[in-house]
Amino acid sequence: MESAQAVAEPLDLVRLSLDEIVYVKLRGDRELNGRLHAYDEHLNMVLGDAEEIVTIFDDEETDKDKALKTIRKHYEMLFVRGDSVILIAPPRN
């Protein structure tokens, strides 16, 4: 990734992330990790080799540790609608 001096506008940071692995937080307790192939000004984007992580809260479960469940799905290529995007960042460890 290039230096922070190349970032003059918010979408410049996204541009610098092209062909890099990114973390995308979505509405509805969804998260994505994948390679950013394309995006537009609405933050519609195409991710390759993407993993979706969905967090579900089971309110009928009495044990709070077991109430939170995650479901993971893998996609070779995925289109993400921009109005569902909350944030884009480098991948979390």
Curated annotation (Swiss-Prot):
SUPFAM superfamilies, per the entry: Sm-like ribonucleoproteins (SSF50182)
SMART domains: Sm
Subcellular location field: Nucleus; Cytoplasm
Example of a GO MF term: telomerase RNA binding
Annotated transmembrane regions: none
Modified residues (Phosphoserine): S84
Keywords assigned: Cytoplasm, mRNA processing, mRNA splicing, Nucleus, Phosphoprotein, Ribonucleoprotein, RNA-binding, Spliceosome
GO-annotated biological processes: mRNA splicing, via spliceosome; P-body assembly; RNA folding
Alphabetized InterPro entries for the sequence: Lsm3, LSM_dom_sf, Sm, Sm-like_LSM3, Sm_dom_euk/arc
Listed Pfam families: LSM (PF01423)
Keyword match Cell division: no
Location of the Sm domain: 9-93
Complexes and interactors: Component of the heptameric LSM1-LSM7 complex that forms a seven-membered ring structure with a donut shape. The LSm subunits are arranged in the order lsm1, lsm2, lsm3, lsm6, lsm5, lsm7 and lsm4. Component of the heptameric LSM2-LSM8 complex that forms a seven-membered ring structure with a donut shape. The LSm subunits are arranged in the order lsm8, lsm2, lsm3, lsm6, lsm5, lsm7 and lsm4.
Record family assignment: Belongs to the snRNP Sm proteins family.
Role played: Component of LSm protein complexes, which are involved in RNA processing and may function in a chaperone-like manner. Component of the cytoplasmic LSM1-LSM7 complex which is involved in mRNA degradation by activating the decapping step. The LSM1-LSM7 complex loads onto the 3'-end of single stranded RNA. Component of the nuclear LSM2-LSM8 complex, which is involved in spliceosome assembly. The LSM2-LSM8 complex plays a role in the biogenesis of the spliceosomal U4/U6-U5 tri-snRNP complex by accelerating prp24-mediated annealing of U4/U6 di-snRNA.
Name of the protein this chain belongs to: LSM complex subunit lsm3
The organism of origin for this protein: Schizosaccharomyces pombe (strain 972 / ATCC 24843) (Fission yeast)
Lineage: Eukaryota, Fungi, Dikarya, Ascomycota, Taphrinomycotina
Underlying gene: lsm3
